[in-house]
């Protein structure tokens, strides 16, 4: 059900049970699955693929142009799995020619003000607390939790079932099943 005060591009493929609140924008080349709710003031840009039963809260921007100087307008995507919740003011960039997509798995919770950069791959059942930030090309396994204000350096990998404590800076790979209570990986000068 589209509100008259939202804009939906005529080429967007929106399932019949999708609810789009006022003042949201849905661009061309977008697919949104059954039962998904799009809050007010959400911007869903070209190349977005959203699964079934997702919730996108106000102020979120999905599939923004990658913040990568090598990006040259390639046809890339940002994909969000079924039952995922994207909270207020989250930004998710689409991929570059490196991976061609940014992927958020199924049953994830991405809390307010988090940023997921281009070419990131997130597994299923991930939880990102407020202000968690991934630089480009990061890979996150299933069931990973990032507490508030975690920053992950580009090209890092975080193994499945890991937990990263709030305020941590991750500059190196984290193996699976690791509980990082406060992690700031050593500086190259240390």
Write out the residue ranges for each language-model feature:
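Structural signal for interior beta-strand "rungs" in well-ordered beta-sheet cores
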Residues: 2-180
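Conserved small/polar residues in nucleotide/adenosyl-binding loops
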Residues: 183-190
